[in-house]
């Protein structure tokens, strides 16, 4: 059976931490920020851990 390829779109959006958790950026902070409160944009800063339910699918796409 041939090797499965890494899904390039997934590889750009997610990364694996040292402990094996899958990390992602929070959505909603790219544009149209004028009407959003500073508090909201700060909350959307940083990384988040992918939920347990989505982890197997992401791992399969990343070929882990």
From Swiss-Prot:
Pfam families: Ribosomal_L35p
Record's keyword annotation contains Ribosomal protein: yes
Cleavable signal peptide: none
Gene Ontology cellular component terms for the protein in this record: cytosolic large ribosomal subunit
GO molecular function, one term: structural constituent of ribosome
Biased composition (Basic residues): 1-15
Keywords: Ribonucleoprotein, Ribosomal protein
Gene Ontology BP annotations: translation
Ribonucleoprotein listed as a keyword: yes
Region (Disordered): 1-23
Matching PANTHER family: 54S RIBOSOMAL PROTEIN BL35M (PTHR33343), LARGE RIBOSOMAL SUBUNIT PROTEIN BL35M (PTHR33343:SF1)
HAMAP family: Ribosomal_bL35 (MF_00514)
Protein family according to the UniProt entry: Belongs to the bacterial ribosomal protein bL35 family.
NCBIfam families: rpmI_bact
Protein name, per record: Large ribosomal subunit protein bL35
Organism, as annotated: Rhodococcus opacus (strain B4)
């Amino acid at each position: 059976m041939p090797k499965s390829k890494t899904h390039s779109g997934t590889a750009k959006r997610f990364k694996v931490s040292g402990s094996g958790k899958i990390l992602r950026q929070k959505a909603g902070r790219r544009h149209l920020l004028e009407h959003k409160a500073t508090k909201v944009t700060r909350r959307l800063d940083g990384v988040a851990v992918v939920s347990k339910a989505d982890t197997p699918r992401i791992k399969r796409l990343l070929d882990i």
